[in-house]
């Protein structure tokens, strides 16, 4: 399947299919040089997939650390200096091969190298179906996740679904959080549909039917980011579960999607408190348990520490913390939430696991 952005200009294709990696070769000849920034784990399992591409004299491979460990100033400078040592021109391509962190990092390299070079996303995880589309790139700060970055559109997104076959279950769980988030944004019917399909760990682990839901997720994100590329309005909805989730992820060092799932439950609790919504918290917790999410760390959540991270969230303004909340299905808002409400919601979340 080939999708296409529909901005007024500078559009890019998104290939979502088995064997999509073959599309890379059609781009290589266009560039003076290309640098494949590949996650160390992906390189371990799939290095041979890139043998043909690396046979080109103008293509170089750079193996980078897996996951969030790569999104540091130190790794950023080291990688930039290596690329610059090859006397690159602006007609250079940075090709990101890996999960969401790899795409974030490589995209920031592309956005800042010579003030901008070509950028191709080759996501290899379920999680990256979300981050590879929409143009957000960046690295982390000691103050929080993704606080240093840019909006930078790729030249192409090449999503080869064959990469998903070897994902460990932890990465399947992490990626599914973003697929599930897109279903929540699409409403009650879409949420019921995905819950009925992926009803337990065994089905989720099999990835049976995942291709369809990944495609739906990408289409959902495309509709939103084309309407609001720079996150001034509806694009903020894509941060559902991320205000609290990023804080949990950054402090407790758990996978992104696991933390987002905790953040999704948390926002349901906040919505119930602020709007007298009737979200069934037990239902969502039991669903996560059925799928195999490890939730034991919830009892160790320390609100004061997490709150400091929440204060650094990019959605905030001078009035304080803003959260994306599902008031009711089909009625999503970005709402200021006071510290006391946030604290009570955290304490309530913990009571479900005592």
From Swiss-Prot:
Cofactor(s) the protein requires to work: Co(2+); Zn(2+); NAD(+)
Compartments in which it is found: Cytoplasm
Domain of life: Bacteria
Binding site for NAD(+): 100-104, 124-125, 136, 145, 163-166
InterPro entries the UniProt entry points to: Dehydroquinate_synthase (IPR050071), DHQ_synth_AroB (IPR016037), DHQ_synth_fam (IPR030963), DHQS/DOIS_N (IPR030960), DHQS_C (IPR056179)
Pathway annotation from the record: Metabolic intermediate biosynthesis; chorismate biosynthesis; chorismate from D-erythrose 4-phosphate and phosphoenolpyruvate: step 2/7
UniProt GO BP: amino acid biosynthetic process; aromatic amino acid family biosynthetic process; chorismate biosynthetic process
Classification via Pfam families: DHQ_synthase, DHQS_C
SUPFAM superfamilies in alphabetical order: Dehydroquinate synthase-like
EC number: 4.2.3.4
UniProt keyword Cytoplasm, yes or no: yes
Keyword terms of this UniProt record: Amino-acid biosynthesis, Aromatic amino acid biosynthesis, Cobalt, Cytoplasm, Lyase, Metal-binding, NAD, Nucleotide-binding, Zinc
Catalyzed reactions per annotation: 7-phospho-2-dehydro-3-deoxy-D-arabino-heptonate = 3-dehydroquinate + phosphate
Binding residues annotated for Zn(2+), in chain numbering: 178, 242, 256
Gene3D superfamilies: 3.40.50.1970, Dehydroquinate synthase-like - alpha domain
Predominant place of localization: cytoplasm
Cellular component terms per the entry's GO annotation: cytoplasm
GO MF: 3-dehydroquinate synthase activity; metal ion binding; nucleotide binding
Cofactor binding annotation: Binds 1 divalent metal cation per subunit. Can use either Co(2+) or Zn(2+).
Family as reported in the entry's similarity comment: Belongs to the sugar phosphate cyclases superfamily. Dehydroquinate synthase family.
Physiological role: Catalyzes the conversion of 3-deoxy-D-arabino-heptulosonate 7-phosphate (DAHP) to dehydroquinate (DHQ).
Stored PANTHER family: 3-DEHYDROQUINATE SYNTHASE, 3-DEHYDROQUINATE SYNTHASE, CHLOROPLASTIC
Name the UniProt record assigns to this protein: 3-dehydroquinate synthase
Gene, per the UniProt record: aroB
